[in-house]
Amino acid sequence: MKVIIVKIWNKINGITLINDDFLNVDLPNESIDLIVTSPPYNVGIDYNQHDDTIPYEEYLDWTKQWLKKALTLLKKDGRLCLNIPLDKNKGGIKPVYADIVKIALDVGFKYQTTIIWNEQNISRRTAWGSFMSASAPYVIAPVETIVVLYKESWKKLSKGESDITKEEFIEWTNGLWTFPGESKKELDIQHHFR
């Protein structure tokens, strides 16, 4: 019998939430229904365990590795919800969203939709320099994307009873979600108390 060791963050009603480095998690193939993740954006954030300043091509190679693993772990009707930025300006402008979606399709994922997450956070309004001499402005989008991908079948193969209301269904199937993201300070506080 194989022993699986992972950092289980929480168990609720038969659902296991795992908080660990995805490439180090040892789980059986086709055993996961849903993966929700926000991978490092490669913009220099200190994650303690991940170098978030690698060259962009290395970042895309690393992305391809974990997307391949995600595909093998998902059930045939499994889904991947991927929170990623539209682009990044640090170290040169890069189309992160477009590059990662292309890699996901190349490794075998099927595309379902993209949800726009309006974080309502425009804290860097002067990032493009002086408005008095705006010769090369940056467009700052206070949004991120949640890309919804699936393995083989978008329709869930096993039927079950819905546990959401009609209103929740309508709200959650709208492609624009508006709620504030957590600040780095809030995340640091949460990490400190775990």
UniProtKB/Swiss-Prot annotation:
GO terms for molecular function: DNA binding; N-methyltransferase activity; site-specific DNA-methyltransferase (cytosine-N4-specific) activity. InterPro entries: DNA_methylase_N4/N6 (IPR002941), MeTrfase_CN4_CS (IPR017985), RM_Methyltransferase (IPR001091), SAM-dependent_MTases_sf (IPR029063). It is an enzyme of class 2 (transferase). One of its GO terms (biological process) is methylation. Transmembrane segments: none annotated. Keywords: DNA-binding, Methyltransferase, Restriction system, S-adenosyl-L-methionine, Transferase. Its EC number is 2.1.1.113. It catalyses: a 2'-deoxycytidine in DNA + S-adenosyl-L-methionine = an N(4)-methyl-2'-deoxycytidine in DNA + S-adenosyl-L-homocysteine + H(+). Belongs to the N(4)/N(6)-methyltransferase family. N(4) subfamily. This is Type II methyltransferase M.MjaVI. It comes from Methanocaldococcus jannaschii (strain ATCC 43067 / DSM 2661 / JAL-1 / JCM 10045 / NBRC 100440) (Methanococcus jannaschii).
